C-alpha cells in the first residue's frame, strides 16, 4: 500500500466518526483529531477561527447545536501526502437534526489539511462551505435561529 492510500485508510474513518459524534452532541472525537499546536485554522461553514484557543469553543458550540447525527459520507475529489503534510478534498454529506428539527442532509465542500505529529495525523486546517442550495438554506436557517 502506498503512503497516500495508508493515509486515507487512517484518516477517512476518523473524519466520518468525528462528524457523526459531533452531530450527536460529542465534540471529543473532533477535538482529538485536531492538533492543539498552532498554527491551526478553521474556515467553517458557520464560524472561522485561528489558534486552538479560538477553535476549541467553536467545536463545543457546534456539538451543542446538533442532534440525531445519523451518518457521514465522503465523495473524494483529491488527496495526497508529502512528508509530514497530507490533505483531503471531498464533498462531505452528513445527516443530523438541529434544535429539535427533524434530521436533514448537510452537504459541504471540505478541504482538510493534516500534519503528522508523533506518528499520528492531526488536522491543522479545515475549510468547509455549503455545496448546494439546500445546504446553504439550512445553514442560513441555523444562523437565523441563533445557533452559531
Locate predicted features.
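A detector for short, charged/polar N-terminal pre-domain segments
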Residues: 1-7, 138
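A solvent-exposed, acidic/Ser-Thr-rich amphipathic alpha-helical stretch
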Residues: 6-9, 13, 27-82, 91, ...
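Generic short beta-strand segments
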Residues: 89-97
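Short beta-strand edge/turn micro-motifs at domain boundaries
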Residues: 107-138
